[in-house]
């Protein structure tokens, strides 16, 4: 299955709780932390919900 690189580029301070939960669910912990996640509908949904905090490649 294809993978997607996701990087947290903005702080989580003051963000909605469900957006923080989506970022945590993707495995991101701090700014400029990058993870590779599988390109599934579940992960795409989390990325789309918190898109303004993330940079997505691939």
UniProtKB/Swiss-Prot annotation:
InterPro entries listed in its UniProt record: Ribo_uL30_ferredoxin-like_sf (IPR036919), Ribosomal_uL30_bac-type (IPR005996), Ribosomal_uL30_ferredoxin-like (IPR016082)
Superkingdom as given in the UniProt entry: Bacteria
Molecular function GO terms recorded: structural constituent of ribosome
GO terms, biological process: translation
Keywords noted in UniProt: Ribonucleoprotein, Ribosomal protein
GO cellular component: a single term: cytosolic large ribosomal subunit
Keyword Acetylation: no
Family from the record: Belongs to the universal ribosomal protein uL30 family.
PANTHER family membership: LARGE RIBOSOMAL SUBUNIT PROTEIN UL30M (PTHR15892:SF2), MITOCHONDRIAL RIBOSOMAL PROTEIN L30 (PTHR15892)
Assembly information from the UniProt record: Part of the 50S ribosomal subunit.
NCBIfam families in alphabetical order: rpmD_bact
Protein's UniProt name: Large ribosomal subunit protein uL30
Lineage, uppermost ranks: Bacteria, Pseudomonadati, Pseudomonadota, Gammaproteobacteria, Pseudomonadales
Gene that encodes the chain: rpmD
């Amino acid at each position: 299955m294809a993978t997607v690189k996701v990087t947290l580029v903005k702080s989580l301070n003051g963000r909605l709780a469900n957006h923080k939960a989506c970022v945590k669910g993707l495995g991101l912990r701090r700014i400029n932390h990058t993870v590779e996640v599988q390109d599934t509908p579940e992960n795409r949904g989390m990325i789309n919900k918190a898109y303004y905090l993330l940079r997505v490649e691939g």
